[in-house]
């Protein structure tokens, strides 16, 4: 499988780590069983017909395995993969260069596809539907359009904000799948597997402690595993024990529920500064000193999932659970409150 990374690369250490532990097949991919079972069927059928796989849209919070699935799809279809992201394709010409370089059966993976420029997105429509693009030669009165045929390919788009996709783009994906947060038990198995590949000793109860505080996210679980390894090595421990895991998590200020410092700042701001809400996300971002997009894409989904936050037409509102935990003594409750399961 050919891999060409066109996006801004992470640091070398992160790349080596991800390459070492990345599952190589659908069978190796932990969790998301219904999604992977369906993809196995679609891939097998496409290969039997000798066709390119239908275009695939993968949505869900960051760190759940969308990029890994794109690599697995490429491997199981027997093609190469080109990797880029929506913000990097700022001109139709850039997209044309990518599309014309694809070979039959290749995968084009576009991360953050919801951030494609409108002109670039429209250029993608004919490529997805008919495997062709129109290129404008020259400019002014002498300009003319030339149609180029493309090799059959599969576009795999990944998004953390599926609601921002336009209807015409969404309609062109034949396969639309959403990834959900992982259970602590699944994350524990992912941690144990990664530790085995990296030759890191980890006790089962330590792996579960890390899993419980990983926000249901494999990327976070693997990152915390690496940090726990650091603490174990500095303490001259042969493996990551429960005590080492807890010391690591406490040092990183990650609480029993997986909330980190920014999670707590967000909830404390809503509860204490805005009296439980509602508050607009722009005001909230200014209050905690974080980018609005980061709050919406990284922090909010998990806080909603675990019942601390609710979205309403008027803004973000702390649930009763959040009010009980983050209210200061003597604080009065005003405004609408939501039970965590409402």
Swiss-Prot record:
One Pfam assignment: RuvB_C
Function: The RuvA-RuvB-RuvC complex processes Holliday junction (HJ) DNA during genetic recombination and DNA repair, while the RuvA-RuvB complex plays an important role in the rescue of blocked DNA replication forks via replication fork reversal (RFR). RuvA specifically binds to HJ cruciform DNA, conferring on it an open structure. The RuvB hexamer acts as an ATP-dependent pump, pulling dsDNA into and through the RuvAB complex. RuvB forms 2 homohexamers on either side of HJ DNA bound by 1 or 2 RuvA tetramers; 4 subunits per hexamer contact DNA at a time.
Residues holding ATP: 21-22, 63, 66-68, 129-131, 172, 182, 219
GO biological processes: DNA recombination; DNA repair
PANTHER family for the chain: HOLLIDAY JUNCTION BRANCH MIGRATION COMPLEX SUBUNIT RUVB (PTHR42848:SF1), PTHR42848
Name listed for the protein in its UniProt record: Holliday junction branch migration complex subunit RuvB
EC number(s) from the headed UniProt entry: 3.6.4.-
Catalytic activity: ATP + H2O = ADP + phosphate + H(+)
Region (Small ATPAse domain (RuvB-S)): 183-253
Domain notes: Has 3 domains, the large (RuvB-L) and small ATPase (RuvB-S) domains and the C-terminal head (RuvB-H) domain. The head domain binds DNA, while the ATPase domains jointly bind ATP, ADP or are empty depending on the state of the subunit in the translocation cycle. During a single DNA translocation step the structure of each domain remains the same, but their relative positions change.
Ranges where the record places region Head domain (RuvB-H): 256-342
Key words, A-Z: ATP-binding, Cytoplasm, DNA damage, DNA recombination, DNA repair, DNA-binding, Hydrolase, Nucleotide-binding
CC terms in the record's Gene Ontology section: cytoplasm; Holliday junction resolvase complex
Protein family (similarity comment): Belongs to the RuvB family.
Primary site of residence: cytoplasm
Binding of Mg(2+), residues: 67
Lineage: Bacteria, Pseudomonadati, Chlorobiota, Chlorobiia, Chlorobiales
Sites where the protein binds DNA: 311, 316
One GO molecular-function entry: four-way junction helicase activity
Span list, region Large ATPase domain (RuvB-L): 1-182
Keyword Signal listed: no
Top-rank taxon, per record: Bacteria
Compartments where located: Cytoplasm
Record note on quaternary structure: Homohexamer. Forms an RuvA(8)-RuvB(12)-Holliday junction (HJ) complex. HJ DNA is sandwiched between 2 RuvA tetramers; dsDNA enters through RuvA and exits via RuvB. An RuvB hexamer assembles on each DNA strand where it exits the tetramer. Each RuvB hexamer is contacted by two RuvA subunits (via domain III) on 2 adjacent RuvB subunits; this complex drives branch migration. In the full resolvosome a probable DNA-RuvA(4)-RuvB(12)-RuvC(2) complex forms which resolves the HJ.
